[in-house]
Amino acid sequence: MALTKAEMAEHLFETLGINKRVAKEMVETFFEEIRSALESGEQVKLSGFGNFDLRDKNQRPGRNPKTGEDIPISARRVVTFRPGQKLKSRVESSNSEK
């Protein structure tokens, strides 16, 4: 099961008592700030959680799996996420409790 933006907004509504429309706007604004920063080439650091980084990948050779034809995979910029130590520790400890 995955946590959705709608579930995050619902949790804000239940926990903080703000109305659902405002909670949804808060969640959307949070993710839009991350998107905007990444689009403008900035790193996003969320203390205690992790970092979103941009990485440039060079062009490399590839192969069409259906035809076996060699094709170039173009250079591109990708987003990577590196979890912080606190997040890693909490995930590891919750996994060992199961």
From Swiss-Prot:
> Which InterPro entries does the entry mention?
Hist_DNA-bd, Histone-like_DNA-bd_CS, IHF-like_DNA-bd_dom_sf, IHF_alpha
Q: Which Pfam families match?
A: Bac_DNA_binding (PF00216)
Q: Where is this region: Disordered?
A: 49-71
Q: Which GO terms describe its biological process?
A: DNA recombination; positive regulation of metabolic process; regulation of DNA-templated transcription; regulation of translation
Keyword annotations for this protein, in alphabetical order, are: DNA recombination, DNA-binding, Transcription, Transcription regulation, Translation regulation
Record Gene3D superfamilies = IHF-like DNA-binding proteins (4.10.520.10)
Which residues, if any, are the signal sequence?
none
Recorded superkingdom: Bacteria
Q: Which GO terms describe its molecular function?
A: DNA binding; structural constituent of chromatin
- Please list the coiled coil stretches: none
For this record, the Gene Ontology CC terms, alphabetical, are: cytosol
Bilayer-crossing regions: none
Q: What does this protein do?
A: This protein is one of the two subunits of integration host factor, a specific DNA-binding protein that functions in genetic recombination as well as in transcriptional and translational control.
Q: How does the record describe its quaternary structure?
A: Heterodimer of an alpha and a beta chain.
Q: Which family does it belong to?
A: Belongs to the bacterial histone-like protein family.
The UniProt entry, under HAMAP family, shows:
IHF_alpha
**What is the protein's name according to its record?**
Integration host factor subunit alpha
Q: Which source organism does the UniProt entry give?
A: Shewanella amazonensis (strain ATCC BAA-1098 / SB2B)
This protein's gene is called ihfA
